[in-house]
Amino acid sequence: MKPSYLLQLRIAQWILGTWLVLGLAGAVLPHAPSLLTGLASDSLALGAVLLLAVVIGVPLGALAGSGPRWADVTLAFTTDWIAAVPVVLLLAFLRPAGVSSVGGLVLLGVLRALEVAWVVRSALLRAARLDTTWAARSLGYMPLSIFLSQRLPAAAGPALAHLALTPVWTFLLDAVGTAAGLGAASSPHSLGALVAGPATGMPSAVAAIFAVVALTWSLHRLGDHYGLRLARK
């Protein structure tokens, strides 16, 4: 590996570690500054959303990409329908209905899972076109161990790259929802809500935006690295 690439990995790991430490401090300290509280809120929200996206999205995408035709059609219809309805509009209907912050996180996780599923499905179909043995194996029985070790890693890189955008995605939803008077998508204490709040000063807003952009870059670098490692196995 090139020294510059290794340096980027170290910086990405340092940024992620700093986020976790500051987020823990914001969750533990009784009178933490609003920026630390936002880091803590976003850390918990991102953890929940990413967990749901991986647990639901990867198996769903694998089923659509290498399973029965109806699974692919259903996923395509669902993702097209979700894409036509902005998440902010969904919040406009769900918030007045009394949906809690936990319910909002579940909604974000499910929406992210559908997007990840589509990315995994597309990556598997693209790999099938490049691998001449895929179609032959698909006609018969493909052991689960072969699918997990040889097929699914082909989708690791695109899926991790897509998941790396989750911090910016959540931040923008929180900021737009707060500015529109609908409330933050994940938490009223999030960084997006902090930036869109009327009482937030310029230094805090700039620091919050920088933190989100830095975390997104960090996750993208780490996702690219580990995605390549999985694809080479």
Name each model-derived stretch.
Residues 119-155:
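Short cytoplasmic-facing helical segments at TM-TM junctions of multi-pass membrane proteins
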Residues 92, 100-101, 105, 109, ...:
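Non-cytoplasmic
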Residues 1-13, 25-51, 194-209:
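Periplasmic/extracellular loop-to-transmembrane helix junction in inner-membrane transport proteins
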Residues 56, 66, 71-118, 122-126, ...:
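Generic hydrophobic transmembrane alpha-helix motif, especially the helices
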Residues 51-53, 92, 96, 179-181, ...:
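Hydrophobic alpha-helical transmembrane segments of polytopic membrane proteins
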Residues 43-52, 56, 144-177:
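Transmembrane alpha-helices
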Residues 68, 108-111, 157, 164-165, ...:
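C-terminal transmembrane helix and the adjacent membrane-cytosol boundary/short C-terminal tail
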Residues 2, 22, 26-30, 45-79, ...:
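Transmembrane-helix boundary motif in ABC transporter permease subunits
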